[in-house]
């Protein structure tokens, strides 16, 4: 539209309001091209409401990003929606005075959006369930790779996690919080996923802490053993106060039957049954604690922040919406798993 057409449309909307009609406008003036973020509202709304005697009803549309009506994948309409039917939440706020500014109305709409986000909780999966679902959908796509040359597809990663879970049951028996001291790597990712699918709370210990600081973390979480790697054990020569077990020894030489059993469960076992089997009948809920992230201990003993599955997965969803990742994108993660962003983004 040119300037003349725009003025005509504003006048027509104003005339409709005076005639007692309901006028619905998209105050941003354009479709968001940045992950569905709410853009600045335009002043045209104030021109429409000038000399009117009608309330303003703020309305928020949540979860539209990814539908055919969004600019997801850099195009509108001509794309396949992420799911069918596509869930959208429409929220209505309290009526606002006629003379409300466009910034005040935007503030109310954003507040509605924050409330609407909480409604997504019923549609969000735990970390383990989301990983299994992704592995089943993207079987041959690369899941993990590291600088040692290791590279795993999603289904091979899921099968490896299943084998690892069987091997770790004895070492982690009777523990809810389990300690891991492994740098960002394929092995570290698999160990974390094994703990999460078992329903454990994984505690990635900060290997830059002093021995005293690591012992404090171990004692606070009542950790009975720490899963690490041979290189880390040799290099750091730490004594955390509990046995340190090398992942290489735990995971080495899986038998033919172990591989076949893991492949069967990974490929054919129904997801719900698989999740119950891996967690011994007690799969975690969204509100269960997925990980504990400790501070650096610069102001005393390290302090642990407990993050639930909902904390982690909702942040992952927000990152995905803001950055609009594609199927062929690759994420280079350098932050360690004992860092909150490292656990969320790197893992």
Identify the role of each PLM range.
Residues 166-209, 334-336:
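Conserved AMP-binding/adenylate-forming
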Residues 151-156, 282-283, 290-314:
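Conserved AMP-binding A3 loop
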Residues 50, 193-198, 219-220, 339:
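Short hydrophobic alpha-helices that are characteristic scaffold elements of the AMP-binding
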Residues 18, 22, 33-100:
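A cross-family acyltransferase "interaction/gating" segment
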